[in-house]
Structures are given as structure tokens and as C-alpha cells.
């Protein structure tokens, strides 16, 4: 019998990775938990903006995918400083054995932004690449990965990947 007394959260979240894919899922599974993020955004004019954010990763959809929620400024700071620069987005990541890579779908409904990428391990790093608009590539990299910290780098290419420009960097530490 269908249990209709479960919440959406109960139906979405999983306690662990799905056993059939557990080894492959650890590429992003290593991030499951809560993180503090120091964020630096670099605008095209060279100016920089800083924010303290939070980033939460968890198992979802029968443990076959990982969802994260990325928030900046951190919720505890939202009332203290008016900040026109903000984000409240989410990413779904799921492994596709047919291509031995990850599908990534990120969206920020408050700013009406979305991006699809393909992600793969690159040595000790993780690299995700997708097209944000015709001819414009976005590359997101997880680097310097340790048990309690990592660095995330967002690059943009206006020439289909010939050259890249850093536009955002985050240093994350486990909360």
C-alpha cells in the first residue's frame, strides 16, 4: 500500500548512495553534508564581490543522485547586510554509466538562470563543462579536495574553450 503520510522531503532524500552505483557515486558523494563557503565573484570590469555562503549536499532519488543547495549570502546574514548580489540555487547530479560521466542540471529560480553540464574526474579534480548560451562555455571545477575542504572555480569562455576567464571562486570548509 502506498504511504501517503510521507512528506516530499521523505520521498526525495535518501540516507545513502544506491548500492548498485555506490563506487561511482562517490565522486560527488564525498561532498555530502554541510559546508561554509567563502565566495569571490569577478565581474567583467575587474571588480570583485565577496560573500559568505552555505552549501548543502545530500543523497536523493533512491540514492541514485546528489542534490545540492547553494545559498549566498548565508541565511544567517541575510537580515544584517542588504546585499543586491545573492543566490539561492540547486544542482542535481546523476551518473550515466553509458557515457561514464555525470549529468549536471543547475538552476537559480530567483535569478531565472539554468545550466546543464557534463562532469568527469580529471585526476584528483572534478571538471564540469556546459554551454550557458550559444558559443559561451561555463567550466566548473572542484579542486584541492580534502575531507574537510575544497576549492570550487567557475570559469567562462567566450570563444568555445580556446581561452578561459575566472569569474567565481569559492573555498569551502565543512560546517
Spell out what each predicted region is.
Residues 1-175:
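Hydrophobic small-molecule pocket/channel-lining residues, especially in calycin-type beta-barrels
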